[in-house]
């Protein structure tokens, strides 16, 4: 049996789409009624709640389980969607030990569900899927607070079948996202298969099962990671920087290693030099209370990992959410300042080279956003924490390439003076609180820009064309020659030079007509009258001759190397033949 004293509480992050029941789930676990006091029943602030093992065992309803679990409890991070998970970072990794992904079993997967899964996959974080709102399945008879296995047996066969159908829709979508999954009580190996727990956060059905699975995951896969140095200096992550009445700027911090004491010197990441300050007060949430309710705090002299704590200290205004916080002494201060500065610098980007600008609200979300754009091989000129400022807008407006005259903003505001400037500029701004939506929106914008650029090129470029002079269709022999032709490939346009298969340029298309009407161009399969200036029938050209539009070398390069994929099949074939004719004498033509 491991030493319980040096085993910290596992940190659990609750993720999922808005209104799918994250806060209600935590509310049920805590036995408080926070949701009812919040706007729109959506969690507004980052909070952390410590749920001791005794409370969990009580929920499970079997005191004999107490000896099976050695973790001291669970520390839940309560936050909108996946945001805290990215904020809770540790040198590029995830700080949360476990996660719950809440999905409405009736609505299925939504944008932030996919976002949560992508982030968890990236950080290899063990998690459980909670299929919530089973009480809304037609005909479901609720059995308050009972384990799922018990309440499921009390339902009719029709209702059981309906639940299984909805459950397997969730499991199927998880499979599509690259996860093997099964109903939790059918899983034989949680290392290979995700457990899906059907619950009703509203009635409490299935909640004991969620707690049981979380404790099991912590015990089985995390025990080695949960050992901490009780006597060592405190190490944590800033969740949020908050102004508090009577205290000024404070930090909500998750301490994940060591001990933090009142009076300790701490170093915290900021946009400039790391902040060095002394802890004036430590405010700890009481067990089973939310960090954000100040009246429920108690002042303490020290805290030990893992814990959510509010820190009051001078000079915290510039602290960054998502940045590290570490206790230092005289001997370690300089080293820790350098470490924290280098960690912030690793995430921030200021290359001055060509690329987009990224702004995010926390260091963790900036890191996640940069990762996603770099994965797509998007060049980034600048990436930093903070709202979109007037200076950012001016800087982006100096970029000529529309693909890079772009500001991406995750969970940030646009300053009013910046907004006024941007309305008059060509800078494109994308803001959202879903990372992959920002990536998708930018990809869509790039595609639109490329299509517009191609369209402009198509309008100005001479495209490949191949045609045959039809027998019995010589209407005029010269000045200009007027002949009937059939377009065999590509497109023929007025004012384009034409050549024979031997490479000789014989004249210029001066006009095209169909049934007496002048037309600017004719595509494959069309039979039209063509006026060719500079050619004489019987000398340079004759019936049955096959001719090609003589595409200029500069245009041929663009066609072959830049817009080839956008050409039609017959245009590609015509271009290929034309290039092979040109390269008989000069293999490097238009290369």
UniProtKB/Swiss-Prot annotation:
<keyword id="KW-0342">GTP-binding</keyword>
<feature type="binding site">
    <location>
        <begin position="78"/>
        <end position="82"/>
    </location>
    <ligand>
        <name>GTP</name>
    </ligand>
</feature>
<dbReference type="GO" id="GO:0005737">
    <property type="term" value="C:cytoplasm"/>
</dbReference>
<dbReference type="InterPro" id="IPR027417">
    <property type="entry name" value="P-loop_NTPase"/>
</dbReference>
<keyword id="KW-0547">Nucleotide-binding</keyword>
<dbReference type="GO" id="GO:0003924">
    <property type="term" value="F:GTPase activity"/>
</dbReference>
<keyword id="KW-0396">Initiation factor</keyword>
<feature type="region of interest" description="G4">
    <location>
        <begin position="132"/>
        <end position="135"/>
    </location>
</feature>
<feature type="binding site">
    <location>
        <begin position="16"/>
        <end position="23"/>
    </location>
    <ligand>
        <name>GTP</name>
    </ligand>
</feature>
<dbReference type="InterPro" id="IPR009000">
    <property type="entry name" value="Transl_B-barrel_sf"/>
</dbReference>
<feature type="region of interest" description="G3">
    <location>
        <begin position="78"/>
        <end position="81"/>
    </location>
</feature>
<feature type="region of interest" description="G2">
    <location>
        <begin position="41"/>
        <end position="45"/>
    </location>
</feature>
<dbReference type="GO" id="GO:0005525">
    <property type="term" value="F:GTP binding"/>
</dbReference>
<feature type="domain" description="tr-type G">
    <location>
        <begin position="7"/>
        <end position="223"/>
    </location>
</feature>
<feature type="binding site">
    <location>
        <begin position="132"/>
        <end position="135"/>
    </location>
    <ligand>
        <name>GTP</name>
    </ligand>
</feature>
<dbReference type="InterPro" id="IPR000795">
    <property type="entry name" value="T_Tr_GTP-bd_dom"/>
</dbReference>
<feature type="region of interest" description="G1">
    <location>
        <begin position="16"/>
        <end position="23"/>
    </location>
</feature>
<dbReference type="Pfam" id="PF14578">
    <property type="entry name" value="GTP_EFTU_D4"/>
</dbReference>
<dbReference type="GO" id="GO:0003743">
    <property type="term" value="F:translation initiation factor activity"/>
</dbReference>
<comment type="similarity">
    <text>Belongs to the TRAFAC class translation factor GTPase superfamily. Classic translation factor GTPase family. IF-2 subfamily.</text>
</comment>
<dbReference type="Pfam" id="PF03144">
    <property type="entry name" value="GTP_EFTU_D2"/>
</dbReference>
<dbReference type="Pfam" id="PF11987">
    <property type="entry name" value="IF-2"/>
</dbReference>
<comment type="function">
    <text>Function in general translation initiation by promoting the binding of the formylmethionine-tRNA to ribosomes. Seems to function along with eIF-2.</text>
</comment>
<protein>
    <recommendedName>
        <fullName>Probable translation initiation factor IF-2</fullName>
    </recommendedName>
</protein>
<feature type="region of interest" description="G5">
    <location>
        <begin position="200"/>
        <end position="202"/>
    </location>
</feature>
<keyword id="KW-0648">Protein biosynthesis</keyword>
<dbReference type="InterPro" id="IPR004544">
    <property type="entry name" value="TF_aIF-2_arc"/>
</dbReference>
<dbReference type="InterPro" id="IPR036925">
    <property type="entry name" value="TIF_IF2_dom3_sf"/>
</dbReference>
<dbReference type="InterPro" id="IPR005225">
    <property type="entry name" value="Small_GTP-bd"/>
</dbReference>
<dbReference type="InterPro" id="IPR004161">
    <property type="entry name" value="EFTu-like_2"/>
</dbReference>
<dbReference type="InterPro" id="IPR023115">
    <property type="entry name" value="TIF_IF2_dom3"/>
</dbReference>
<dbReference type="InterPro" id="IPR015760">
    <property type="entry name" value="TIF_IF2"/>
</dbReference>
<dbReference type="InterPro" id="IPR029459">
    <property type="entry name" value="EFTU-type"/>
</dbReference>
<dbReference type="Pfam" id="PF00009">
    <property type="entry name" value="GTP_EFTU"/>
</dbReference>
């Amino acid at each position: 049996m491991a030493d319980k004293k040096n085993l910290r509480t596992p940190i659990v992050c609750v993720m999922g789409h808005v209104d799918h029941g994250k806060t209600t789930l935590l509310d049920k676990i805590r036995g408080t009624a926070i949701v009812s006091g919040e706007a729109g029943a959506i969690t507004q602030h980052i909070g952390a709640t410590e749920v001791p093992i005794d409370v969990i065992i009580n929920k499970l309803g079997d005191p004999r389980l107490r000896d099976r679990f050695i973790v001291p409890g669970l520390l839940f991070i309560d936050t909108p969607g996946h945001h805290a998970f990215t904020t809770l970072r540790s040198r590029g990794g995830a700080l949360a030990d476990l996660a719950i992904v809440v999905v409405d079993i009736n609505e299925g997967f939504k944008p932030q569900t996919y976002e949560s899964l992508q982030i968890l996959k990236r950080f290899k974080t063990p998690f459980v899927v909670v299929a919530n709102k089973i009480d809304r399945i037609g005909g479901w008879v609720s059995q308050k607070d009972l384990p799922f296995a018990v309440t499921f047996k009390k339902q009719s066969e029709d209702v059981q079948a309906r639940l299984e159908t909805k459950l397997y829709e969730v499991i199927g979508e998880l499979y599509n996202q690259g996860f093997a999954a099964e109903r939790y009580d059918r899983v034989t190996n949680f290392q290979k298969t995700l457990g899906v727990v059907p619950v009703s956060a509203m009635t409490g059905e299935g909640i004991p099962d969620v707690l049981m699975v979380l404790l099991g995951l912590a015990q089985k896969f995390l025990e080695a990671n949960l050992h901490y140095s009780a006597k060592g200096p405190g190490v944590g992550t800033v969740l949020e920087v908050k102004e508090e009445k009577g205290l000024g700027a404070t930090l909500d911090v998750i301490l994940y290693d060591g001990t933090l004491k009142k009076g300790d010197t701490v170093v915290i990441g900021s946009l400039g030099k790391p902040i060095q300050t002394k802890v004036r007060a430590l405010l700890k949430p009481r067990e089973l209370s939310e960090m954000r309710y100040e009246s429920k705090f108690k002042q303490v002299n020290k805290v030990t990992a893992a814990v959510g704590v509010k820190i009051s200290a001078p000079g915290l205004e510039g602290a960054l959410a998502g940045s590290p916080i570490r206790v230092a002494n005289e001997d370690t201060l300089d080293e820790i300042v350098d470490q924290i500065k280098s960690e912030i610098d690793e995430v921030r980007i200021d290359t001055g080279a060509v690329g987009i600008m990224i702004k995010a609200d926390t260091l963790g979300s900036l890191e996640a956003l940069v990762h996603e754009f770099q994965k797509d091989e998007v060049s980034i000129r600048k990436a930093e924490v903070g709202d979109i400022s007037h200076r950012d807008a001016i800087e982006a407006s100096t970029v000529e390439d529309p693909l890079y005259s772009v500001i991406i903003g995750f969970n940030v505001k646009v300053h009013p003076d910046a907004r006024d400037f941007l309305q008059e500029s060509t800078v494109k701004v994308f803001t959202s609180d879903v990372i992959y939506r920002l990536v998708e929106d930018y990809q869509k914008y790039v595609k639109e820009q490329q299509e517009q650029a191609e369209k402009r090129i198509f309008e100005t470029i001479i495209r490949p064309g191949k045609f045959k002079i039809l027998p019995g269709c010589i209407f005029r022999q010269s000045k200009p020659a007027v002949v009937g032709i059939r377009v065999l490939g590509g497109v023929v346009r007025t004012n384009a030079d034409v050549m024979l298969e031997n490479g000789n340029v014989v004249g210029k298309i001066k006009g095209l007509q169909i049934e007496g009407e002048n037309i600017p161009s004719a595509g494959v399969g069309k039979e039209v009258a063509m006026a060719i200036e500079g050619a004489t029938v019987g000398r340079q050209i004759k019936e049955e001759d096959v001719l090609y539009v003589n595409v200029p070398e500069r245009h041929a390069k663009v066609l072959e190397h830049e817009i080839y994929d956008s050409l039609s099949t017959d245009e590609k074939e015509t271009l290929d033949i034309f290039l092979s004719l040109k390269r008989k004498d000069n293999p490097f033509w238009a290369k």
